[in-house]
């Protein structure tokens, strides 16, 4: 990553928005074969934090993609085009790094502030979630899903000897589906939300 100048400000305080360049060679390398690696994570003060990245998956072998059509529900094949990593700093999980469709989404917490790196208007921006002018950010969608789960009292709890296990389904309505270019793109978005929720639950174990 490197920092660049931008006029695209998505926060009330312009100091809470930074434009970053993504090293495409690094992105390709990650997509191909990296399971664990060290990353220099960009911070809002234009410095970097050395963090550990560890690959994980939210997809089970029984994963199904079900599409509602005029003829009823259809189960279709899904070829994963999605990589997810936990971001760890000093032994603690602080966020997720998601790589799909030749792009990335990063969400992490540092110094009690929640940050996100996402592609907005064809530009990668790092911004403070709590100062953001955009209502439907990735981090906000993850928080909404967590609140929904917390309100439900019947989700499975694991024993203290084993990690928490959640079975989640994400239902996408027609309006939301039409904001994406394909079923694969829509599915990747849903998996990204689940991966974000997974990181929060994993960090609480």
Could you say what each language-model-derived stretch is?
Residues 4-19, 125, 130-205:
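Fold-level signature of zinc-dependent metallopeptidase catalytic domains
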Residues 1-119:
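N-terminal prosegments of processed precursors
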Residues 85-88, 106-108, 124-129, 134-135:
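Generic recognition of long tandem-repeat/solenoid scaffolds
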